[in-house]
């Protein structure tokens, strides 16, 4: 006899796969996060991601295909090894972001690092046992003061206990965002691991924000992951002699875009402590949103439509605007050439991702 108290849909719900939109967002974020270490995934990774988004393969099968792809490659150069890291870690991040399971704990944080970098770093999931410094572009070659190796675990446990006991009730959204910026910047500053700290912190933070009830599913991490890292750096750096003080202002701008769908344009050059990159002409960052994109009338029309409906077809766009489908196709290509939009998924089932910010 069946248990009438048991929810007949319980098993189905528990095993419900992520939606195409969620998969697309997970892959986009996963790929974008490789920028924090200057890594670029291969074309094979993009092809595999598209198959996953289109439902041709599962997220687990995508990871297996990536692993198999590199098993057959021997004698790789340094650049090829970096591409392999980008591909494998992208697939693993996409899987973690597609999984709703999460516990707010130091062990979860460490586990994420292990899952992302197992077989890539020999120290995956291990707390570092030596002190580190890192020259930062945004600090004009200076370094943040990272956590001391002798008490990393104690520091990590302390930060988690402080956040676990923090009460968000009664806070305004601005106060909440400020607190979240302080928490995540302090967690990142510990730099528990030898490598891979920013990507681990980003994945953990996204899952924590979801646990708090936030929708962290827009393109902020996908398009501005290096800005996120530089903002973390500026939140942890003070040089009184130079008149530079730690600030979460940049990180809070990023979080407002992420959590409140605000449309701040995020410029890495604005964070450089020297101020020498504030003019567009001196901007060294090869970033499609660093410099203004000039759009023509038809391009603006199509962009407005894509903001409303990223899944709209060319035929539907042509009807909306009152032009031919071939005109829409040419305009979309111009927008892609200018770096204003990009396409994820197949022609039939894909979606447009807006890079240009109004």
Give residue ranges: language-model regions.
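FIC/Doc superfamily catalytic core
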Residues: 1-358
């Amino acid at each position: 006899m069946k248990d009438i108290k048991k929810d007949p849909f319980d098993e189905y719900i528990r095993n419900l796969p992520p939606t195409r939109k969620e998969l697309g967002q997970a892959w986009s974020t996963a790929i974008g996060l490789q920028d924090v270490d200057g890594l670029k995934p291969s074309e094979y990774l993009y092809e595999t991601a598209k198959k996953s988004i289109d439902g041709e393969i599962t997220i687990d099968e995508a990871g297996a295909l990536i692993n198999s792809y590199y098993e057959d490659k021997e004698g790789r150069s340094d650049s090829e090894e970096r591409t392999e890291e980008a591909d494998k870690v992208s697939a693993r991040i996409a899987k973690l972001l597609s999984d709703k399971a999460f516990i707010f704990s130091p062990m979860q944080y460490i586990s994420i690092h292990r899952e992302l970098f197992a077989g890539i770093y020999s120290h995956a999931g291990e707390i570092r046992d030596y002190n580190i410094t890192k020259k930062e572009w945004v600090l004009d070659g200076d370094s943040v003061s990272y956590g001391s190796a002798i008490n990393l675990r104690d520091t990590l446990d302390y930060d988690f206990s402080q956040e676990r006991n923090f009460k968000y009730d009664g806070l305004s959204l601005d106060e909440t965002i400020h607190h979240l910026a302080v928490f995540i910047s302090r967690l990142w500053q510990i730099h528990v691991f030898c490598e891979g700290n920013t990507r681990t912190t980003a994945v953990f933070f996204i899952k924590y924000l979801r646990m708090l009830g936030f929708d962290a599913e827009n393109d902020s991490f996908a398009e501005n992951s290096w800005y996120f890292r530089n903002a973390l750096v500026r939140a942890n750096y003070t040089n009184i002699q130079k008149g530079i003080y730690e600030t979460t202002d940049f990180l809070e701008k990023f979080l407002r875009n992420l959590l409140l769908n605000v449309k701040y344009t995020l410029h890495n050059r604005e964070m450089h402590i020297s101020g020498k990159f504030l003019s567009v002409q001196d901007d060294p960052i090869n970033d499609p949103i660093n410099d203004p994109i000039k759009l023509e009338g038809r391009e603006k029309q199509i962009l407005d439509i894509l903001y409303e409906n990223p899944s709209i077809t060319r035929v539907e766009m042509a009807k909306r605007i009152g032009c031919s489908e071939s005109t829409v196709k040419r305009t979309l290509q111009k927008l892609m050439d200018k770096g204003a939009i990009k396409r994820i998924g197949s022609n039939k089932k894909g979606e447009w991702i807006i890079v240009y910010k109004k």
